[in-house]
Regions:
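Positively charged n-region of N-terminal signal peptides that target proteins for export
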Residues: 1-5, 18
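Hydrophobic helical h-region of N-terminal Sec-dependent signal peptides
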Residues: 6-10
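C-terminal motif of bacterial Sec signal peptides marking the signal peptidase cleavage site
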Residues: 14-16
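Short, low-complexity N-terminal intrinsically disordered segments enriched in polar/charged residues
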Residues: 18-67
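Short beta-strand edge/turn micro-motifs at domain boundaries
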Residues: 22-23, 136-161
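Hydrophobic pocket/interface hotspot
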Residues: 49, 61-62, 69, 81, ...
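A short gly/proline-enriched turn/hairpin at secondary-structure junctions
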Residues: 70-80, 92-95
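Surface-exposed, charged secondary-structure patches
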Residues: 90-128
Length: 161
């Protein structure tokens, strides 16, 4: 009788462990699926940003930023908030025309915040002299999910060459 009780207890403990492992596996799978969905949404945002840059379209850039977004261009002052960000991009687009592609190195999501590291490569047409030059930058995006949408909260880049 004593042995039967021990076997029954062991069997119950084993079943409980298997159930816990199954729950952990299900939670892990669900988290992976959520991460994949979030990363896909961020990729879409980054490629929309690339398209807006290539079109030199301030009106397509601005909605991609949060209301308090910060643009930190290389060799220029930081722009904070929609008005300054708009003025910065208007100036940039008056000076150059980009033709670039983005290559995503890394996206890390943590709740409603994420960061992305990218490299952009292509060409830049300088309006002042009509010259086209090679363009290659590395970028860091800090992203924030607001109202269910990923947006650029902070963005900075520097030239690689």
């Amino acid at each position: 009788m004593k042995n039967l009780f021990i076997y029954a207890t062991l069997l119950l403990a084993l079943a409980a462990c298997q159930n816990e492992t199954k729950n952990q596996s299900n939670n892990s799978t669900q988290n992976n699926m959520e991460q994949t969905t979030e990363k896909s949404a961020i990729e879409k945002l980054l490629f929309s940003y690339r398209d807006a840059l290539n079109a030199s379209d301030v009106n397509k850039v601005l909605p991609l930023y949060t209301s308090e977004g910060v643009f930190m261009p290389s060799n220029a002052p930081s722009a904070v908030g929609q008005e300054q960000v708009k003025a910065s991009y208007e100036f940039v687009f008056s000076q150059i025309q980009l033709n670039i592609e983005f290559y995503i190195d890394e996206i890390v999501v943590n709740g409603d915040y994420a960061f992305a590291r990218t490299i952009s490569k292509g060409t830049t047409l300088i309006h002042a002299n009509g010259q086209t030059v090679a363009e290659e930058n590395r970028e860091l995006f800090v992203l924030q999910k607001t109202n269910g949408q990923w947006k650029i909260s902070r963005y900075m880049f520097n030239k690689m060459k």
